[in-house]
Each structure stands twice: as structure tokens, then as C-alpha cells.
UniProtKB/Swiss-Prot annotation:
Protein name: Large ribosomal subunit protein uL15
Family: Belongs to the universal ribosomal protein uL15 family.
Cellular component terms per the entry's GO annotation: cytosolic large ribosomal subunit
The species this protein was found in: Euplotes crassus
Compositionally skewed regions (Basic residues) per UniProt: 1-30
Length: 148
């Protein structure tokens, strides 16, 4: 709330406004922003922002950030990728085999945890664990390796 007893009201008409000689208390005396962290702001930066200045470690020029990206799915969750209609067809008609392309659903690797129903199926994936491969073949299915 404005009122007449504020200092700014009292100092109207006085050139320096209580900041000494003309030209003082203007602009950016310490520089703008993070200017001078190794010079005139050294103590503050070293105290409150340790590690801000200098190089740390080495650069990896040919770094592949997604090198180890390999989302996996267990055998127990494999049937959740199949629609209910396809499941019913596979249960009734034994001549039809279900094809599950795991990569289309966003997974790369099939792990061997869990059991499969006694329905043959073909699974396409980039990688299979030995137990997953064994259990899929026990049911009468097949494992197909897929490149991309």
C-alpha cells in the first residue's frame, strides 16, 4: 500500500536518492549473472557451488547411450500380448498357431520365468534365454530370432 511517509516520497527531487554521488548505485557493479566466478565472485561460488568451475572426468566421443537398452518380458506375461479372440481361436482350433511378435509390443528379450498353456505358438524376438527357448519348444512352439 502506498503512503506519503515512504522514503521514496521524501527523497523526490534529490538527485542521488540517498546513494551518494551522481552515478553511484547504478547498472551492474558485480557484472551480470554468473560473471566473475573465478575472480571477484570467487568465494561465493566456491562456497555455495562446489564443482561449478573446472573440468571433471573425460569425454566419451563415440558413446552410444542406448547400447544396453533391452526391455524384456517373461513367459508368464507373454499371453497378455494376445487378444482374447485369438486366444479362444487357438484353444478351439488346434491347426492354427498364434504368432507373437514381441518387438512390435516394445520388448526385445524373452525370459523364461513362468509357465505357458499347452497351446503351440511362434514367438519372434531379438533374444531368448535358454530356459525360455526350452519351455516354448516343450509346448510345441517355435522361437524365431528377429534382427530389427
Amino acid at each position: 500500500m502506498t503512503h506519503s511517509k515512504r522514503n521514496t516520497r521524501k527523497l523526490r527531487g534529490h538527485v542521488s536518492h540517498g546513494h551518494g554521488r551522481v552515478g553511484k548505485h547504478r547498472k551492474h557493479p558485480g557484472g551480470r549473472g554468473m560473471a566473475g566466478p573465478e575472480h571477484h565472485h570467487r568465494i561465493n561460488v566456491f562456497k555455495y557451488h562446489p564443482g561449478h568451475i573446472g573440468k571433471h572426468g573425460m569425454r566419451h566421443f563415440h558413446l552410444m547411450r542406448n547400447q544396453y537398452y533391452c526391455p524384456s518380458i517373461n513367459l508368464s506375461k507373454l499371453w497378455s500380448l494376445v487378444t482374447e479372440e485369438e486366444r479362444q481361436k487357438a484353444q478351439t482350433d488346434k491347426s492354427k498357431v498364434i504368432l507373437i511378435d514381441v518387438v512390435k509390443h516394445g520388448y526385445y528379450k524373452v525370459l523364461g520365468k513362468g509357465l505357458l498353456p499347452e497351446v503351440p505358438l511362434v514367438v519372434k524376438a531379438k533374444l531368448f534365454t535358454p530356459t525360455a527357448e526350452k519351455r516354448i519348444k516343450q509346448v510345441g512352439g517355435a522361437c524365431v530370432l528377429r534382427a530389427q
